[in-house]
Amino acid sequence: MSTMTPREIVSELDAYIIGQSEAKRAVAIALRNRWRRMQLPEELRQEVTPKNILMIGPTGVGKTEIARRLAKLANAPFVKVEATKFTEVGYVGKEVDTIIRDLTDMAVKQIRKIEVEKNRMKAQDAAEERILDILLPRAKNKWGETEYEKDSATRQVFRKKLREGALDDSEIEVDISSQMNVEIMTPPGMEEMTSQLQSLFEGLSPSHSKKRRMKVKDAMKVLIDDEAAKLVNNEDLKQKAIESVEQNGIVFIDEIDKICKQSDRGGADVSREGVQRDLLPIIEGSTVNTKHGMVKTDHILFICSGAFQVARPSDLLPELQGRLPIRVELKSLTKEDFERILTEPSASLTLQYKELMKTEGVTVEFTPDGISKIAEAAFHVNEKTENIGARRLHTVLERLMDGISFDASERSGESVVIDEKYVSEVLNDVVDNEDLSRFIL
């Protein structure tokens, strides 16, 4: 779990996302509260429930990007899902329970990685012994049993060479344990049955080893992973993963506005109101059956987001609104925001294009007036057509860089300055013609 303070979390998000300080503060506080809760006495800890968040804002202002960056900062089980992928129980499509199953699978992977790292030193020693056994087979007694006597002088010499890398390029044949992978194809909506059948068949198939010929340095890596996996207790791992999900799990549900029931629509809304009803018990707190065990969702943090351009937050079921007490509104981006997006983030769009062209030997330089003109063009097209936020910058920049990207391999050693004049020459015809900008930008 992340031990970062809210200020540190916001500072980390600022490196990638421009503006939206209110949304950053809300997720930073929610993430820090996960840590605060774990410091409380057991009895009080059970009473403190997470305050779920609803992020409201037009497309392209940073809702999904906040989720992506939060996943890296959280250091906890985190899953991002699209609300539109789910349907009501009984219909063809994914059921909402799969959210918790995916979250548990994610936690198992995380914990397994941690456990493998913990056992890496022991695994390294075991892998070293296995390689030495191949290079210098141990003597056998008269009954054919291997004798594990104290290391001989020759074995010590080979051990020293192995550690110094003198044997790295020697080829050896190693036994790698492997288990049969079973792939089962089922229709959508039957994920639970799939995982149960998969577990059953994997349990029935015996693990066996296969011989592979490789260099000593490659064999060492493979054998370390093999030995580390053997040292991990799967039952303890599952228990830790379930506990991690229950206490620290975070679920980000995007496009929640798309499952609002619209009053002007008739007929059955299979993927709308029914999905909301199915989400209620999971967000409120229930027990979900997964292949790793039963998972309680009482203390999982849910962050929902939506553009709410057609629907309104009040169109959500009242019970669901009550389970999302913290509302955060993300603001539309201005021309100044676009300028900052082009230059300030640690992996800004202009930097990406510069580095891409540098691989071909072409030096690209963006001047301040050129960046201002690009931002103005993107903002202007957003105003005249559909407002898709910062995503418009990708489209405008691709159009702007089209000629340079195409000819880059033949222009090695050249320098290109992208200033206001250059941007105007390339983009003005498209930006000023509303019909063209609607289809091209």
Swiss-Prot record:
Q: Name one GO molecular function term.
A: peptidase activity
Q: Which parts of the chain are coiled coil?
A: none
Q: Which InterPro entries match?
A: AAA+_ATPase, ATP-dep_Clp_protease_ClpX, ATPase_AAA_core, Clp_ATPase_C, HslU, P-loop_NTPase
Query: GO biological process annotations for this chain's record?
Result: protein unfolding; proteolysis involved in protein catabolic process
Q: Name one Pfam family in it.
A: AAA_2
Q: Which SMART domains match?
A: AAA, ClpB_D2-small
Primary subcellular site in the record, as a coarse category: cytoplasm
Give Gene Ontology CC terms: HslUV protease complex
Q: Where in the cell is it found?
A: Cytoplasm
Gene3D superfamilies in the record: 1.10.8.60, DNA helicase RuvA subunit, C-terminal domain, P-loop containing nucleotide triphosphate hydrolases
The residues the record assigns to binding ATP are I18, G60, V61, G62, K63, T64, E65, D254, E319, R391
Recorded family membership: Belongs to the ClpX chaperone family. HslU subfamily.
Describe the function of this protein: ATPase subunit of a proteasome-like degradation complex; this subunit has chaperone activity. The binding of ATP and its subsequent hydrolysis by HslU are essential for unfolding of protein substrates subsequently hydrolyzed by HslV. HslU recognizes the N-terminal part of its protein substrates and unfolds these before they are guided to HslV for hydrolysis.
Q: What is this protein called?
A: ATP-dependent protease ATPase subunit HslU
Organism taxonomic ancestry: Bacteria, Pseudomonadati, Pseudomonadota, Gammaproteobacteria, Pasteurellales
